[in-house]
Amino acid sequence: MTSDSAIPNLGSNSAFSDAESNSTVVNPKSNSTSPDAESNSVIPDAELNSVLQYLKLNAEVTNVESDAPMVDEQVNSAPAHINLPDLDLDLEPISPATDVNSNSGWLSLNSPESVVDNKVKNNIQVQLKTEAGRLLVVLPTELQVPATEFTWSDIWQQLKFRLNAGDRLRTRNTTVHLVAYDRLLDGRQLQQLAETFSEVQLQLKSVATSRRQTAIAAVTSGYSVEQLQPETILSSEPKATSTPQADALYLEMTIRSGVEIRHPGTVILLGDINPGGIVVADGDILVWGRLRGIAHAGAGGNRDCLIMSLQMEPTQLRIADAVARAPEKSPTHFFPEVAHITSQGIRIVRSTDFSRNQISKINQTP
């Protein structure tokens, strides 16, 4: 026998009708009271109590949330309300503009926190050089940056980015010589490198290292090994400033906001540099596209370096220690232009005029 207290008033605006709005399935048209019936119209006491308890808890949570400070709401909306500091175009070194909505953590070759000294950081990266028909992949030494600050994940992601950015001059099936110096690598890491090279039709053939463990791992994996002496690495450090620039870096991509490219040589970009994007090079910077971000050529102090672009709309230009800001009014017509240093500072001229000027200077030279 079912008492009246066990049957809720389905026609009233009781708390159970609120439960129905919370996806609890009830058939209000059935009036059957048989416990063996297949209808769900009679709700057991336990289930009814659980629903009422659920509604009670929800009501308490709602009251707490309405009385508490809007902490969660402020946290979730923080990216939309963060007031990023304006980019000070006169500060040293260049401060990259950060886009909180960008995915800057594989593509970020150098994060904003790592920008401490331009001249030092230019060489603290994986370098690619061509020599005698083979590709040299040079890892930074632990003397330059400890393994705790430049981890294997950083090395691997940076190398993948450099390879996948696209080098039009790269020949397929080119052999790769890995110069690991004093970096400690195991067999698993060497295998990851070999697979990464294989994805872009390159073949890892040899490893140069001063670490015995790395040499053993390389031999075990079937690679030729060139044993380096630690003294050689130490003695070569003071001569680092006299070494020639690295090979030109060719990229096919768009440098988006929050992305920074640094290279100890010339950078040739087939694509755009968006506002907030940064390219820093010890050599020239050639942009076969729109330059709307920051470009710093001659970062090592070479005032003869140039910045060239098909469409020059920079946020900031730097050549060596000279800085130029963008004009307040954007030009209405665009031409291929060249930025270079004069006695009055950085000057931007049409590429045709620059060529004529250069020819005139050459002709005037005794």
UniProtKB/Swiss-Prot annotation:
Region (Unknown): 1-59
Subunit-level organization: Interacts with MinD and FtsZ.
Record GO biological process: cell morphogenesis; division septum assembly; regulation of cell septum assembly
HAMAP family: MinC (MF_00267)
Superkingdom classification of source: Bacteria
Protein name, as recorded: Probable septum site-determining protein MinC
Organism: Nostoc sp. (strain PCC 7120 / SAG 25.82 / UTEX 2576)
Gene: minC
Signal sequence residues: none
Keyword set includes Cell cycle: yes
Family named by the database record: In the C-terminal section; belongs to the MinC family.
Residue ranges of the region described as Disordered: 1-42
Family matches, as Pfam families: MinC_C
